[in-house]
Amino acid sequence: MILTALRGALGFLTRIPVGRDEAAWAAFARSPWTFPVVGYLVGGLVALSLFVPAPAPTVALAFVLAVYAVTGIGHLDGVADIGDAAAVHGDREERRRVLKDSALGVGGTVALALVVLGLATAALGLVEVAATAGDGGPLPPVIGIVVAAEVGAKAATATLVCVGDAPHEGLGSALTGESSPGATLSVFALAAPAALLTWPQVLPGLAALLVALATAALVARWSRRRLGGVSGDVLGATTELARVAALHAGVIAWTRF
């Protein structure tokens, strides 16, 4: 059951070729704790791109490419849809209609640009951390920050899965309908150790985790008021927004405190 759930999580949350089948999906849908576990693996893989021997802008590009090579670009569709919905001056029904529209509007374009730009600038900050940080801890600081941010982003998404209600049938309801608020305990328990990955400095890892969760809270509040609940697009957008926010928080905490 555990391995099947993890395989389902890897198949859904990444592009790692583990195969997809109904049993794995069903096990994953009932196991939100798999989100942060996958975050540890994804964070470790994409962090390796920061050690490319190249100028900082090239390393930043490599990092962005690595993120989407490992996780895919499916969540960016959620960013675009939520961006378009946020730009609508109308009621919930109008915003939901926009979510189902495959055309990309101005709001979605701006949202996508900001997320990718945010990811690239965070990578530049990580390059600076790598160049100036010492080797006092068990892991290079940039690896700790990236993994903590990815675990935080996945835990943030899992939290919405556990506490959210979908406004309509779809991916959101397929996940939220299988979990309960009590499942957040296992999510938080598995995500918490990521705060120690920047040891001996705990603040950068802790900041990344907490800011990711705070991002989820803000997205959840907005989606409930504007959309009536947590849809699949909201979950995808939460992952992307929380990752960017968490990376910047980790870099700021390392360089300024």
From Swiss-Prot:
Keywords noted in UniProt: Cell membrane, Cobalamin biosynthesis, Magnesium, Membrane, Transferase, Transmembrane, Transmembrane helix
GO cellular component: plasma membrane
Family to which the UniProt record says this protein belongs: Belongs to the CobS family.
Membrane-topology descriptor: Multi-pass membrane protein
The gene coding this protein: cobS
EC number, as in UniProt: 2.7.8.26
Superkingdom of the organism of origin: Archaea
Record protein name field: Adenosylcobinamide-GDP ribazoletransferase
Gene Ontology molecular functions: adenosylcobinamide-GDP ribazoletransferase activity; cobalamin 5'-phosphate synthase activity
